């Protein structure tokens, strides 16, 4: 953060001193720093959206509008005033202040969901209420109340049960409102349902609902053996100490186990993974039939990983599906992605050839372990049939979803240029790739329920922001927004991109260079 501020200060100073263009403004820190009085005025216009099944909805300040993918026209679904009325607000009051963060939890139902504040029956302590409203019948469908100080919220879209953490203990509240404690001995030394391993290996949460929402896998982390590392919280009026558990290199690290809780029985079983000492458990995934759990297990040296399958009902280890090792490191970052049309196959992401790519695993074709050499002295061992789905000297950056009819997968990659991100689809049966955008700049996408449309958000050095709705079958897009350049009245420096060779004379190192306004190539800066 300090480096970014220094860079911004240098840039603003150069712009202020060297700006020579007639009639143009010079940037100030208020213009460029988040929190500045004019910062938001210099951000490009945006369009806030959410998917309602296969339909794209504009979630605006004052209401929600369905967007027609063929012509971009909008149809009002409901207004903010109407939503507040349905939530029980009076004429001169409001329960929610905007529609930016509403959700559409069921693609087949005219339901909108939001969170409102409330006071529960537990002594008047503040609560939050997840409320679902039918905007066709204009009535509440159901509500779910939970403590306002709850963290790590994880709601199952199938059962509508909610998992949450409070004071390091894990709880589950069912759709009917019954709350049960999964743990009771949580503390700073023993935490449940939270992220573990300091968020390494793609870990972003600590709970994992089964597809049907009837079972909950969760992390339990014993960090009592890890010493407190002193930190200072400078956000308080007077700085306070804020110790955290940090396993220093060569010192003892925390021990993680994985449990599976069933709300209908109130029982927990534990995966029989063995001694957790000096091991990492990550990328927890459920099988589509809710019966198996897959987990990637690494040693502390982080140079050997195993993909292991467990029986969810008993916790018994069933076997190893895949192994990967490398003399430097192995870094699994993603869980399994099962094909919606074939539950015996899943997509696995690996950097085993030096670049992150997609591999198709077929569980219906077990085999004697096949060992292969991989990138720079690494090796992998396949216990089922594995087919590379993508390959090359480029990186798969993000998987967006599936086109269910064409049986394709949509993803972002930097195949065109290392500094770009573009949207592709790849046909699973043969690996045929199709570019779905203009091949320029940086694109981010989100896909509707059946993969027929992708919302494409694009920017480049000459395009502030462009948002389109693209048909994934033919690649044709309908522009929804092209933002005007908010910097057009300012002295903007020239920004160039390029590459230089590393010390080995072979490796390309890519850069972005910001030149002073009125740059003189003959002048030494």
Where are these regions (language model features)?
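Bacterial N-terminal signal peptides
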Residues: 9-17
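Beta-propeller folds
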Residues: 21-447, 452-453, 461-465, 470
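Basic side chains
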Residues: 4-5, 220, 425, 512
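Serine-hydrolase catalytic core recognition
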Residues: 227-228, 290, 296, 442-525
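Bacterial N-terminal signal peptides that target proteins for export
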Residues: 1-10
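Short intrinsically disordered, low-complexity coil segments enriched in acidic
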Residues: 1-2, 74, 385, 521-524
């Amino acid at each position: 953060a300090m480096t970014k501020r220094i860079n911004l200060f240098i840039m603003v100073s150069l712009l202020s001193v060297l700006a020579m263009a007639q009639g143009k403004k010079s940037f100030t820190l208020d213009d460029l720093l988040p929190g500045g009085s004019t910062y938001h005025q210099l951000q490009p216009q945006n369009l806030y959206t959410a998917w309602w099944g296969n339909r794209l909805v504009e979630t605006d300040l004052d209401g929600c509008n369905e967007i027609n993918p063929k012509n971009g026209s909008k149809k009002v679904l409901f207004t903010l005033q109407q939503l507040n009325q349905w939530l029980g607000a009076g004429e001169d009051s409001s329960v929610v202040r905007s529609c930016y963060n509403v959700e559409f939890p069921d693609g087949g139902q005219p339901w909108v969901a939001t969170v409102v504040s409330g006071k529960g029956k537990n002594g008047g302590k503040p609560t939050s209420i997840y409320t679902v409203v039918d905007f066709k019948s204009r009535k509440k469908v159901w509500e779910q109340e939970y403590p306002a100080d709850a963290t790590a919220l994880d709601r199952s879209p199938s059962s509508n049960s909610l998992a949450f953490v409070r004071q390091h203990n894990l709880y589950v509240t069912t759709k009917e409102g019954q709350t049960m404690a999964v743990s009771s001995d949580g503390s700073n030394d023993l935490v449940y349902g939270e992220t573990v391993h300091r968020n390494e290996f793609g870990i972003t949460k600590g709970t994992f609902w089964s597809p049907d929402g009837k079972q909950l896998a969760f992390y339990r982390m014993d960090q009592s053996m890890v010493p407190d590392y002193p930190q200072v919280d400078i956000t308080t009026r007077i700085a306070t100490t804020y110790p955290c558990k940090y396993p220093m290199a060569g010192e003892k690290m925390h021990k993680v186990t994985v449990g599976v809780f069933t709300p209908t029985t109130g029982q927990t079983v534990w995966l029989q993974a063995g001694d957790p000492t000096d091991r990492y458990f990550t990328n927890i995934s459920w099988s589509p039939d809710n019966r198996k759990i897959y987990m990637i297990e690494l040693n502390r040296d982080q140079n050997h990983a195993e993909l292991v399958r467990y029986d969810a009902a008993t916790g018994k280890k069933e076997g190893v599906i895949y192994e990967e090792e490398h003399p430097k490191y192995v870094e699994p970052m993603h869980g399994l992605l099962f094909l919606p049309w074939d539950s015996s196959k899943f997509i696995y992401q690996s950097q085993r050839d030096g670049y992150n790519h997609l591999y198709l695993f077929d569980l219906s074709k077990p085999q004697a372990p096949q060992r292969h050499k991989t990138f720079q002295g690494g090796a992998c061992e396949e216990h089922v049939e594995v087919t590379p789905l993508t390959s090359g000297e480029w990186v798969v950056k993000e998987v967006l979803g599936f086109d269910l009819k064409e049986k394709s997968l949509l993803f972002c990659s930097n195949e065109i240029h290392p500094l770009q991100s573009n949207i592709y689809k790849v046909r699973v049966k043969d690996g045929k790739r199709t570019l779905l955008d203009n091949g320029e700049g940086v694109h981010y996408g989100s896909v509707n329920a059946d993969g027929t449309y992708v919302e494409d958000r694009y920017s480049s050095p000459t395009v502030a922001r462009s948002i389109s709705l693209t048909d994934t079958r033919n690649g044709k897009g309908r522009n929804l927004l092209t933002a005007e350049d908010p910097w057009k009245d300012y002295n903007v420096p020239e920004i160039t991109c390029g590459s230089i060779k590393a010390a080995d004379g072979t490796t390309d190192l890519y850069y972005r260079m910001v030149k002073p306004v009125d740059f003189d190539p003959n002048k030494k800066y």
